[in-house]
Swiss-Prot record:
Annotated S-S bridges: none
Gene Ontology molecular function: proton-transporting ATP synthase activity, rotational mechanism
Keywords of this entry: ATP synthesis, Cell inner membrane, Cell membrane, CF(1), Hydrogen ion transport, Ion transport, Membrane, Transport
Organism (species): Geobacter sp. (strain M21)
Protein name: ATP synthase subunit delta
Main location as per UniProt: membrane
Topology versus the membrane: Peripheral membrane protein
Gene that produces this protein: atpH
Function: F(1)F(0) ATP synthase produces ATP from ADP in the presence of a proton or sodium gradient. F-type ATPases consist of two structural domains, F(1) containing the extramembraneous catalytic core and F(0) containing the membrane proton channel, linked together by a central stalk and a peripheral stalk. During catalysis, ATP synthesis in the catalytic domain of F(1) is coupled via a rotary mechanism of the central stalk subunits to proton translocation. This protein is part of the stalk that links CF(0) to CF(1). It either transmits conformational changes from CF(0) to CF(1) or is implicated in proton conduction.
TM ranges: none
PANTHER family: ATP SYNTHASE DELTA CHAIN
Amino acid sequence: MSTNAIAKRYAKALVQLGSEAGTVDSFNTELDRFSALLTESRDLSAVFANPAYGIESKREVMKELVAKLQLSPMISNLLMLLLERGRISVLPEISQSYGAFADELSGVIRPTLSSGLPLEAGQIEEIRSALAKSTGKKVELKVEVDPSLIGGVVTKIGGKVFDGSVRTQLARIQDILQKG
């Protein structure tokens, strides 16, 4: 089974438990914090991945981290389970999948809006409103400036890309001229 499939199973189960307990958002925050710690600290990741360290040593390290980060018992149990099963390295993917499932549950989408030039607040709000109206969901828009676009905007929602950039329009014109 792929690590992505494994991550989705753990994430989905945790979202269901969080939904029942009303702790979806706090679980998301805790997963993100611990996942960031694993990603940023190569030494910590190396300890958990190294078979030379026994499971008891790894448990002690995990207990200290859980206490220091003040993680909930549910997240603590998940981390211990992942550690026992040798799957702690999958945590960043679990965290990412959890965030996606939590957003789906709460009716949130997180599109990325890239523009060739900085956009004004009014323009951003207009785009956010249009996306909310067309999707029927709450929109958490991430705005980026990409000078290579020359002008226009590119919006990415999940796996879909809506490209209204000048760069793409110029590329299309070039293709037409070369073929014609």
